[in-house]
Amino acid sequence: MTETNKGVERHLLASNADLFARREQAVARGVGNMHKLFVERARNAEVWDVEGKRYIDFAGGIGVLNTGHCHPKILAAVEEQMRRFTHTCFQVVLYESYIELAERLNALAPGDATKKTLFLTSGAEAVENAIKIARAYTGRPGVIAFNGGYHGRTLMTLGLTGKVAPYKIGFGPFPGEIYHAPFPIEVHGITVE
């Protein structure tokens, strides 16, 4: 059975294998996938694939779903916001809820110094901005990153990533002044001394 929506055919009874074959034809190879299953729905800490198999979600959107999938309070808040407006680029259109959340986070941050918040759309964007802020504040260009760490897919964050395969092969040269060091784990014989 199929359903057509503006020229795109959607298979209502597709299998994971069928969808992965379509993925191979339509999606760039640079987008890696850890699993070959396609999620159809999710609730709390469980996901169901398109074949109806249930799984426990140990990935949680790589750490961004600490409330679980489809939490009722999150759904209600999103629905309320969507009814008001959906534009989210604060640099173009200002809105009070951005400031309210920044104030709440600033109040939670430790220490007596003045706090300010910057919201970004991805981890890579956050890392790149942290590097820019640190370089501007210190006047020093050097950055230390730990071996084995993963920081993102932009050129700067790939340079910081401490694992060559599969992330960095064929993408250099990377930005300069990035130095890699082993992460201090005493059980591995590496200490902070």
What do the predicted segments below correspond to?
Residues 103-193:
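PLP-dependent aspartate aminotransferase-fold enzymes
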Residues 48-49, 67-68, 159-161:
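Short beta-strand-to-turn element immediately C-terminal to the catalytic PLP-Schiff-base lysine
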Residues 1, 52, 143:
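Conserved S/T- and glycine-rich ATP-binding loop of Class I adenylate-forming
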Residues 7-11, 66, 93, 159, ...:
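A general boundary/transition motif marking the beginning of the first structured unit of a protein
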Residues 2-43, 93:
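Active-site-adjacent loop/helix segments that line or gate small-molecule/cofactor pockets in enzymes
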Residues 27-35, 61-63, 70, 84-88, ...:
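Glycine-rich, flexible loop/turn motifs
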Residues 11-13, 54-140:
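Glycine-rich loop-to-alpha-helix module at the N-terminal edge of alpha/beta enzyme cores
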Residues 36-59:
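Active-site and channel-lining beta-strand-loop segments
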